[in-house]
Amino acid sequence: MAKMWAGRTDGMTEKIADDFNSSIRFDSRMYRQDITGSMVHAAMLASRSIITQADADALIEGLEGILNDIDSGALPIDMECEDIHMFVEQELTNRLGDVGKKLHTARSRNDQVALDIRMYLREELDTVSQLVKQLITAVTDKAEEYKSAIMPGYTHLQRAQPITFGHHLMAYAMMLLRDVERLADCRKRMNRSPIGCCALAGTTYDTDRDYEAKNLGFDGLCLNSLDGVSDRDFCAELMSDFAILMMHLSRFSEEIILWSSWEFKFVELSDAFTTGSSIMPQKKNPDMAELVRGKTGRVYGDLMGLLTTLKGLPLAYNKDMQEDKESVFDAVDTVKMCLQVFVPMVQTMKANLDNMKLAAQKGFINATDLADYLVKKGLPFRSAYKISGQLVAYCIQNNTVLEALPLDTYLQYSDLFDQELYTAIDLMTCVEKRISKGGTSVASVEAQIKYVREML
């Protein structure tokens, strides 16, 4: 098949080479951005008298027709074309004849594809950001519901100190809020227009790059034409942000998986977000959370694939850069899918308050508060720490808990103990004493909820 770029060569390539070289099976998803960019480009060419207004009007009308026909299904994208840019230009030329051949004036596919992918990823970034905000809202609403629900807090997966389930959930809300901030920051660098950089050196035509940038929603220009066509930092940065976001979702998923197990029984997932077993009728498997955890590695792989592709490329454009899209598109699709399932999974998740509280009553998670009680009586912390540890060891040896020890036993370890110690080591008291900013007290959790909602 002869190509629109035939000139130096006859354009007659082997079928296997055509298939190997083609990107339309994956870059066709950018047809809307490609056509929108071309309409603005045609208008700019007319505004600078590079083509006539009549030709520009015909080009824009023809492009609108192609867009409408693709949207309606009347025009299937020809997968035999090399890429989406060539498909659109070929279809336009078929409809308009020689006028269609004027569209590519003062433009290269190098800056055209750089434009398309920035516009496409800008939209996808905004979609992901909104999905993350929906998840933050779901997590925050759940945190408010359970702001007084006592559970063990863990370090090393060992029971450590009493917290509330609301406090634990708000930790994820804060992580996700940082993800939103990172995406917004990435968008600033992404939203620079490369159109007008042409192949690599700019153009001899008196174009108006600012006109195109403004009308395509960009905040400014790529100010070096070599950089404009070869830059894929915004892809790598977006995928880095996605990798961190997926890491947060994976950590949350891991805890949901643990919490929903019989060993914990802290939460119950809706049947709508679990599956059964083909052989074990009693099973209720947290497959959605497990898949999110598994797909995290996939997004990491997409990022590493892109970075590896880019690491040795000389300036400016190289065909290797065609390989950026499949990695980026896969990461976009995966992240969106994970968020779309995560939001309702959290919204429908129920906490088992009795099991959480029962778990908090074991493991001596109020031992720190016992030490703090002695510190407030005037004992140095390290001395108080030692006494508290000795009392825990005594309880373990005698199969009891701190709350059940008589005062006489406490007095054998320190004469600073009195009846008030039982209030000090009460679990709800332990929680409510954590009044520092960011702490687990109900008031502190309420302040965190208020902050996050204001930030959204």
Give residue ranges: language-model regions.
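Conserved hydrophobic residue
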Residues: 50-51, 75, 265, 380, ...
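Charged, flexible cofactor/metal-binding loops and thiol motifs
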Residues: 117, 122, 144, 152, ...
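Short runs of predominantly hydrophobic/aromatic residues within well-ordered alpha helices
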Residues: 38, 85, 89, 235-238, ...
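A generic structural-conservation signal
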Residues: 54-55, 152, 222, 383, ...
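Generic, well-ordered alpha-helical scaffold segments in large soluble proteins
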Residues: 41, 62, 66-69, 91, ...
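A helix-coil-helix interface module used to build multimeric assemblies
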Residues: 1-202, 207-211, 275-276, 287, ...
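Short, well-ordered beta-strand elements within core beta-sheets of diverse protein domains
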Residues: 41-51, 120, 167, 236-244, ...
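Glycine-rich cofactor/substrate-binding loops
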Residues: 1-37, 98-99, 280-456
